[in-house]
Amino acid sequence: MATAGKVIKCKAAVAWEAGKPLSIEEVEVAPPQAMEVRVKILFTSLCHTDVYFWEAKGQTPVFPRIFGHEAGGIIESVGEGVTDVAPGDHVLPVFTGECKECAHCKSAESNMCDLLRINTDRGVMIADGKSRFSINGKPIYHFVGTSTFSEYTVMHVGCVAKINPQAPLDKVCVLSCGYSTGLGASINVAKPPKGSTVAVFGLGAVGLAAAEGARIAGASRIIGVDLNPSRFEEARKFGCTEFVNPKDHNKPVQEVLAEMTNGGVDRSVECTGNINAMIQAFECVHDGWGVAVLVGVPHKDAEFKTHPMNFLNERTLKGTFFGNYKPRTDLPNVVELYMKKELEVEKFITHSVPFAEINKAFDLMAKGEGIRCIIRMEN
């Protein structure tokens, strides 16, 4: 493209300080360096992780910063050494990468790339420790290697998944984070047998995707656990068959679930990150064969406490990161599931706003309205 090798001036939503509305600014985006790509973002969406680090309550504040990591776009230009993708390719940016060289990438059992694993505190590119964004010569920091709240962004090539160009980017962009995290937690990690019973703790975006994954895997009972009863009706669309609100009971929720299921659920997936919910999700699975999968990210000082007999009685506890998907290897296949109509991504998308109104997406999330809000970069 004519812009290759040159600085691009474009619009970006800049967070100047914690918790303050984003400001649409003209930024300069430098060309990609070795093993980097510059991507034209067409659609992006707001994920709770963006809000969490934008609020920066207890996290390292890195500002000014361009947030955003759930998106779809087209490669504008590539840096030296990039052979996997070319200008014009359709891609999904991913907050965690796959270098394809490290021990994790070479292992069939891991997706925790040594080089490109998520780092929320780093606001610069790993190649040279510098930002590719600037305003009047002053750096604007990156977020989790993606920074998709910008018309153009620069990423390491290991953080983009090349996908089918026929796939609608305004739909499949949500597959680059939350949807795949929940879906994979069920399909790849919990692996519920056909006809089994699954409990899903937390019916936000990731929990609904986990319920969808359990439904696709063939679970016959999917019990949604949430403190907000207004989420129950929505969750039926994602396969939930029953609901438990812990507030409605005067006994621990793991006991309620055990009574409902003749001794415990076959699988549970915990999507809140609340340490008590994590413990409940483990203790509610059936002895002998029950498997609990932890997805939600806990408070940094949280401690998981349970009696060792819960393990000795043959319950299994697993953790997962990004649904155990390797971004570059596996995400194109998840997109193909959508193209074959095996995934109903549309149910996930409840709102859409133009880029100029990006702060509306933050307002919707603050009010707990909807699931995903698509931000349209061009109109």
UniProtKB/Swiss-Prot annotation:
Highest taxon, organism lineage:
Eukaryota
| GO biological process terms on file | formaldehyde catabolic process
Cofactor binding summary note? Binds 2 Zn(2+) ions per subunit.
Catalytic reaction annotation: a primary alcohol + NAD(+) = an aldehyde + NADH + H(+); a secondary alcohol + NAD(+) = a ketone + NADH + H(+)
**MF term (GO), any:** zinc ion binding
What does the entry list as the binding residues for NAD(+)?
49, 202-207, 226, 231, 272, 295-297, 322, 372
Positions binding Zn(2+) 2 in this chain are C99, C102, C105, C113
Q: What top-tier enzyme class does this entry carry?
A: oxidoreductase
Q: Which residues form a coiled coil?
A: none
Q: Any idea where this protein resides?
A: Cytoplasm
Q: Which cofactors must be present for this protein to function?
A: Zn(2+)
Q: Which family does it belong to?
A: Belongs to the zinc-containing alcohol dehydrogenase family.
**PANTHER family noted in UniProt:** ALCOHOL DEHYDROGENASE, ALCOHOL DEHYDROGENASE 1
What name does this protein carry?
A: Alcohol dehydrogenase 1
Which species is this record about?
Zea mays
* Gene that encodes it: ADH1
